[in-house]
């Protein structure tokens, strides 16, 4: 293991939230990240501001990332899920202060319509978005987040059917 790899493993995880946002057809909102040339699709996620509860952070991040807060929380994950970003990305993300994220996930029912979604927010994270079926979700997600997404799907799957 290289010294830089050991150093990265010593970094903490950034506390955050993730949102599995469902429409009326039980399809899941996914956005294509604006900050990469590769096809990096993901569900909305973001950091927790100090003093903020995870549920408040989830609804704030939903508004910030999809331009709408029309929805309600169906469930909160029982666990904090974590993932490591590839080591070459660490210096480019969060000022190099974190090795990845530790997230509480929320299943959210979107009560608006497609016209309520506006990814052209003040700090856009996505340049495209769409609704994905549960079956296709794991195949389009960026690979280093796939294991986390599998765990989230497993936890929420019975509530989506």
Curated annotation (Swiss-Prot):
UniProt xrefs under CDD domains: NUDIX_Ap4A_hydrolase_plant_like
| Main EC class the enzyme belongs to | hydrolase
The chain positions of domain Nudix hydrolase read 12-154
Tell me which EC number(s) this protein carries.
3.6.1.-
One molecular function GO term is: metal ion binding
> Tell me, which GO biological process terms does this entry list?
mRNA catabolic process
Cofactor(s) this protein requires: a divalent metal cation
What's the protein name?
Answer: RNA pyrophosphohydrolase
């Amino acid at each position: 293991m290289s010294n830089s790899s050991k150093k990265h493993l010593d970094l903490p995880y950034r506390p955050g939230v993730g949102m599995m946002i469902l429409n009326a057809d039980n399809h899941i909102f996914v956005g294509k990240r604006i900050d990469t040339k590769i096809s990096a699709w993901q569900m909305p996620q973001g950091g927790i501001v100090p003093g903020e509860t995870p549920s408040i952070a989830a609804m704030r991040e939903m508004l910030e990332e999809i331009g709408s807060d029309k929805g309600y929380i169906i469930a909160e994950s029982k666990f904090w899920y974590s993932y490591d970003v590839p080591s070459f990305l660490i210096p480019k993300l969060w000022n190099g202060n974190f090795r990845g994220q530790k997230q509480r996930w929320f299943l959210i029912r979107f009560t608006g319509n497609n016209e309520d979604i506006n990814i052209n927010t003040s700090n856009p994270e996505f340049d495209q978005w769409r609704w994905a079926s549960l079956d296709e979700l794991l195949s389009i997600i960026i690979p280093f987040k796939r294991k986390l997404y599998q765990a989230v799907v497993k936890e929420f799957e019975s509530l989506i059917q």
